[in-house]
């Protein structure tokens, strides 16, 4: 009987009769014929039921209540329920179950309270629904009270109630209680076992889930397709072989491969990049639908197999299967991954044609695609603005995209707007906003978000905890970062890697290396993501021995082939003056990228092998590796140090005209330095005046340094004034200007400049040097000769060496102040305490002065020892009285 016929019959009959007995029977008969989508008929019946006072008839009301629930009219059903004068346990249970299925868990529990207050005794199905609502809310407290009622009413051994209770305890993390409850069940069936396995999988207890499956088989309980769907979910985390075993079990047991099970198998194989196996599952039987095909498309997308993903997408359409919102979302994700804006626009047009423009899933994928594929955020913002119901994923995608595009300030306004619209941000949203805080180094915002996380009790979650650590560390709040780490429930490599990265950025390289001990204390081993950070810290400290230990660790741990590790090793060996080792590591890189080549070119140039560095660059071009902005910074610096003026100018033009790389301020600084060292001050000034970017203080400082060397007082004063206008608290500008006045015969102006420094409470940046001896890094700071303790052992050793130099017949006498320079202290400490065969490697934060350079050079003539000093400009390798820089002392200006 069709809906229209039933509706017509109901209307005709009701208009002809007032006989209540017949009316009741007819209403029940009509309702029994109603189809699940015939809500209109329900309204036809409901009206006369109220009109003729038939709400006393329990069978009629229960039938009508069931009709409303079948047609998704849960709140209309609730209105009818409230109108009923007598409510049976069936009516209460049906309503509570409906709220539970609709995930209206709080409403289900509230209705249960009303039921208990009415004196109606719940049955096993009532308890099962109530317990499932408690599980949905993760409310173990209320669930425990319900459990007490279950025991009192004798339902604890019931498989339906017991399974729900086991699920509740599992979801609330009380696995011991869950297992004990399950063991007490009488005749646990397939559904009960599957629920327990599902709970364990949901709680990420993968091995325990497989163990339960094994016990299920031993108990002689046959698994069904839903059991295997859950087990495949566990296998995705346990490994390929586990999943293959489960697949074999499915075949051996003759479980029919329905669409749900096939989709789970496809998802499983695609996670392990076994797409050929996934396709075989797709073709294994005739039953297919859009969800199964979408799963295959998603698998190809996940594995970045663009051609196959698009081919499968087109094939499913040719078979008459209309892609759904998830299919289009997957294809748009592919466009995002391969940065294909044109194809993404085509898919966008298709979604509009087939009516998915209002789909939130498609909208989210479009926002992500436009953010990742466009140079601008405009189109993504337009799509977001047109969305009917943006959810938390929509807002989060937009926020993350804005962070990537550099619009970090806008993220905070979006977060406020999101909360205002009652969309609750999740941990990914907040992690994205914290990334914005890291870029801005905005500690106040970090504190605000941290407070919000504390109120929500999610500050200990690993994803958001890692973002908090990074945000605090980037804002120089290292103690706060450590407090977050200590409060986290779980920590991983990312937790410590972000901290090490920030320590390196802040110049706290010793602290970066100390993090290794904390990682090991947590049972976390360095991986290919964290190793480069520690190797970089070793490089910046000149800790060659530590760097070599990390190199050995990378080989033993199987990370020696990782490009990121090899690139960092090239940099480390170069900075430690061990160029042969750097070249050996470079040769191990299977396919050197631009970062690899930059490391080699930079290492050669900084160690004084300018010609070899330029040759390496030419080889890089021959190998068709495209240079980047950093490459040209390295080349310009090399030309500056090597006095290769014309070649430096040529590289600057090549960068712009051949490689279309727009020069940044840093490139102009080097260009000005090249011209300044060559005495071409007028050209250098012209570059500053005509550059398309606003010059910074460093450019004027570079020109001032050149003016000091060339004795150009008037231009030097002009550069100093312009530099101080931009950086009034930079002591280097005052010092350079004062030195220029001294050397130009203007001592009174020099003193006036130094007095101005004193008034502003500015002081010269202290020289700091480090030296590694027997795996431990020692630090030294330059001291004022008037304050130093001359009984200090290092000072005594320096004076002793100076006397030895005099006896050697060298004209070197040394500046008394220079005796306390940090580089000289570090060199002498390494000379005394390092093993006789070990070289001494020192790192200094400033350019090595003339006196210290001469001292170290003569020292290596007296003793057969290699001493390497890496200063703020280059690496100096001293051996047999000579330095690798091979430059006149003016280079130390």
Swiss-Prot record:
Residue ranges of the region described as Type E motif: 699-774
Listed Gene3D superfamilies: Tetratricopeptide repeat domain (1.25.40.10)
UniProt subcellular location: Plastid, Chloroplast
A single GO molecular-function term is: RNA binding
Q: Write out the GO biological process terms.
A: RNA modification
**Hey, which family's this protein in?**
Belongs to the PPR family. PCMP-H subfamily.
Name this polypeptide is given: Pentatricopeptide repeat-containing protein At5g52850, chloroplastic
Could you tell me which species this protein originates from?
A: Arabidopsis thaliana (Mouse-ear cress)
Lineage, highest ranks first: Eukaryota, Viridiplantae, Streptophyta, Embryophyta, Tracheophyta
């Amino acid at each position: 009987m069709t809906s229209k016929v039933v509706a017509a019959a109901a209307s005709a009959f009701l208009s002809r009769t007032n006989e209540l007995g017949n009316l009741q029977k007819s209403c029940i008969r009509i309702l029994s014929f109603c189809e699940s989508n015939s809500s209109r008929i329900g309204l036809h019946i409901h009206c006369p039921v109220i009109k003729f006072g038939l709400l006393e008839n329990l069978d009629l009301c229960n039938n009508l209540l069931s009709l409303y629930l079948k047609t998704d009219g849960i709140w209309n059903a609730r209105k009818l329920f409230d109108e009923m004068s007598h409510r049976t346990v069936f009516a209460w249970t049906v309503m509570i179950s409906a709220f539970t299925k609709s995930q209206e868990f709080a409403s289900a529990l509230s209705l249960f309270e009303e039921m208990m207050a009415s004196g109606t005794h719940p049955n096993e199905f009532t308890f099962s629904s109530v317990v499932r609502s408690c599980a949905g809310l993760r409310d173990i407290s209320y669930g425990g009270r319900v459990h007490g009622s279950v025991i009192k009413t004798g339902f604890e051994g019931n498989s339906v109630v017991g399974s729900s209770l086991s699920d509740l305890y599992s979801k609330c993390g009380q696995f011991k209680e869950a297992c004990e409850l399950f063991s007490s069940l009488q005749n646990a069936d397939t559904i009960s076992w599957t629920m327990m396995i599902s709970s364990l999988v949901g709680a990420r207890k993968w091995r325990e889930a497989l163990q339960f499956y094994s016990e299920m088989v031993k108990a002689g309980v046959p698994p069904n397709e839903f059991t295997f769907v859950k087990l495949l979910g566990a296998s995705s985390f346990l490994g390929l072989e586990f999943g293959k075993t489960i697949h074999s079990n499915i075949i051996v047991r003759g479980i029919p491969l329905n669409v749900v099970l096939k989709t789970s198998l496809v998802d499983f194989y695609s996670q392990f990049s076994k797409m050929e196996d996934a396709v075989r599952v797709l073709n294994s039987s005739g039953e297919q639908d859009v969800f199964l095909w979408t799963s295959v498309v998603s698998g190809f997308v996940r594995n970045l197999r663009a051609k196959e993903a698009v081919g499968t997408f087109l094939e499913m359409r040719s078979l008459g299967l209309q892609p759904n919102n998830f299919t289009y979302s997957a294809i748009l994700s592919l466009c995002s991954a391969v940065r294909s804006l044109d194809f993404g626009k085509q898919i966008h047009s298709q979604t509009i044609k087939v009516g998915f423009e209002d789909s939130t899933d498609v909208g989210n994928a479009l926002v992500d695609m436009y953010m990742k594929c466009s140079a601008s955020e405009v189109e993504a913002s337009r799509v977001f603005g047109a969305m009917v119901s943006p959810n938390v994923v929509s807002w989060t995608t937009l926020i993350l995209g804005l962070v990537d595009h550099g619009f970090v300030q806008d993220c905070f306004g979006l977060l406020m707007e999101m909360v205002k619209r009652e969309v609750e941000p999740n941990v990914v949203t907040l992690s994205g906003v914290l990334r914005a805080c890291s870029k801005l180094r905005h500690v106040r915002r970090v504190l605000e978000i941290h407070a919000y996380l504390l109120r929500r009790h999610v500050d200990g979650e690993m994803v958001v905890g890692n973002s908090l650590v990074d945000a605090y560390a980037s804002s120089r709040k290292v103690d706060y970062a450590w407090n977050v780490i200590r409060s986290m429930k779980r920590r991983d490599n990312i937790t410590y890697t972000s901290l090490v990265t920030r320590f390196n950025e802040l110049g706290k390289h010793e602290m970066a290396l100390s993090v290794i001990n904390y990682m090991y204390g947590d049972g976390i081993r360095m991986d290919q993501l964290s190793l480069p950070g520690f190797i970089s810290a070793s490089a910046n400290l000149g800790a060659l021995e530590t760097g070599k230990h990390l190199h050995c660790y990378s080989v033993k741990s199987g990370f020696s082939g990782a490009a990121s590790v090899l690139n960092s090793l090239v940099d480390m060996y170069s900075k430690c003056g061990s160029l042969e080792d750097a070249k050996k590591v470079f040769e191990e890189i299977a396919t050197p990228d631009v970062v690899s080549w930059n490391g080699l070119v930079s290492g050669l140039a900084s160690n004084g092998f300018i010609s070899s560095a330029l040759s390496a660059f030419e080889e890089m071009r021959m190998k068709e590796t495209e240079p980047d902005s950093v490459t040209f910074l390295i080349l310009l610096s090399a030309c500056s140090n090597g006095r290769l003026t014309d070649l430096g100018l040529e590289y600057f033009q090549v960068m712009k005209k051949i490689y279309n790389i727009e020069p940044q301020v840093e490139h102009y600084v080097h260009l000005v330095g090249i011209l300044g060292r060559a005495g071409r001050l007028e050209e250098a000034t012209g570059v500053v005046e005509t550059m398309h970017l606003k010059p910074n203080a460093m450019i004027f400082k570079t020109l001032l340094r050149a003016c000091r060397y060339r004795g150009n007082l008037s231009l030097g004063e002009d550069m100093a004034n312009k530099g101080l206008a931009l950086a009034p608290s930079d002591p280097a500008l005052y010092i350079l200007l004062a030195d220029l006045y001294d050397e130009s015969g203007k001592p009174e102006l020099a003193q006036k400049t130094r007095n101005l420094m004193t008034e502003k409470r500015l002081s010269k940046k202290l020289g700091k040097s480090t030296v590694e001896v027997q795996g431990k890094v020692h630090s030294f700071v330059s001291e004022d000769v008037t304050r130093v303790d001359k009984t200090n052992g290092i000072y005594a050793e320096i004076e002793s060496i100076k006397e030895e130099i005099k006896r050697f017949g060298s004209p070197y006498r040394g500046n008394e102040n220079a005796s306390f320079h940090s580089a000289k202290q570090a060199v002498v400490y390494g000379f005394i305490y390092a093993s006789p065969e070990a070289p001494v490697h020192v790192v200094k934060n400033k350019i090595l002065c003339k006196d210290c350079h001469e001292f170290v050079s003569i020292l290596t003539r007296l003793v057969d020892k290699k001493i390497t000093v890496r200063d703020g400009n280059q690496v100096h390798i001293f051996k047999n009285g000579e330095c690798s820089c091979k430059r006149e002392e003016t280079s130390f200006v």
